[in-house]
Design a protein with these regions (language model features):
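P-loop NTPase catalytic cores that bind/hydrolyze ATP
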Residues: 158-161, 187-189
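Amphipathic alpha-helical substructures
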Residues: 171-191
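Catalytic cores of eukaryotic secretory-pathway lumenal/extracellular enzymes that build
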Residues: 1-2, 6-154, 160-162, 168-172
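Single conserved hydrophobic/aromatic residue that forms the stacking wall/gate
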Residues: 193-202
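Mature extracellular catalytic domain of secreted serine hydrolases
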Residues: 134, 149, 187, 191-193
Length: 202
């Protein structure tokens, strides 16, 4: 299971128990999974790469090698956000060990035919995508084009770092106006600690 950014393996703590021990959560033993939740290179517990070239494809190759070294002949991969990109690359590389992938942020565009004669439902979806591109994706542009400018600013200001990340929790969780409706304060602070570490490495 691969996380995204801003994110960390902390995001998975509520699903690990039910997946690895379903009996303890009113499930059946046959539904149990082994879960491997690595931190992306340079995030959380993973060291910052010392060489260039650590893009999505390289991480996908390394994740497959990790699974082999851990003794898994077959596995499934799941990812969200950047984890979706890594997981998609695992599937596309088709190295033989991965039996299937699941992504919760698929990278797919609308079919050209749908754009030529969009339905009302298509228009609602396209309007939402445009709104996100215009008003919700600024963080991505900043992080992808000027990461060090942002990194120096955030590492120098704990309040700036907290505000930058908490705004994402506000926008991206179904929190009904307050992130603590979804995550308690300890969970938010633990996430903030894991998410802040890569900023210091920028």
């Amino acid at each position: 299971v691969t996380h995204g950014w801003p994110g960390s393996i902390v995001e998975f703590h509520k699903v690990i128990g039910p997946l690895v021990d379903p009996v303890a959560h009113d499930g059946v033993a046959q539904d149990a999974f082994d879960l491997i939740c690595p931190s992306l290179p340079g995030y959380g517990f993973s060291a910052k790469p010392t060489a260039t070239g650590w893009g999505v494809e390289k991480i996908a190759t390394v994740w497959n090698e990790l699974m082999i070294r851990l003794g898994y002949e077959r596995y499934f991969a799941q990812g969200g956000d950047w984890g979706s990109a890594v997981t998609t690359a695992i599937g596309l590389q088709n190295l033989g060990q991965c039996a299937g992938i699941h992504v919760n942020m698929p990278n797919a565009g609308a079919p050209k035919e749908a754009l030529l004669n969009p339905t009302e439902r298509d228009m609602v979806a396209l309007s939402g995508a445009k709104y996100y591109a215009d008003w919700g994706a600024g963080y991505s542009k900043q992080q992808s084009t000027r990461p060090q400018t942002l990194g120096y600013g955030l590492v120098d200001s704990p309040m700036g770092q907290a505000t930058w990340i908490m705004e994402k929790f506000y926008e991206w969780t179904d929190c009904n106006g307050h992130p603590e409706n979804v995550l308690n304060r300890d969970e938010l602070l633990l996430s903030l600690i894991h998410i802040s570490e890569p900023t210091r490495r920028t």
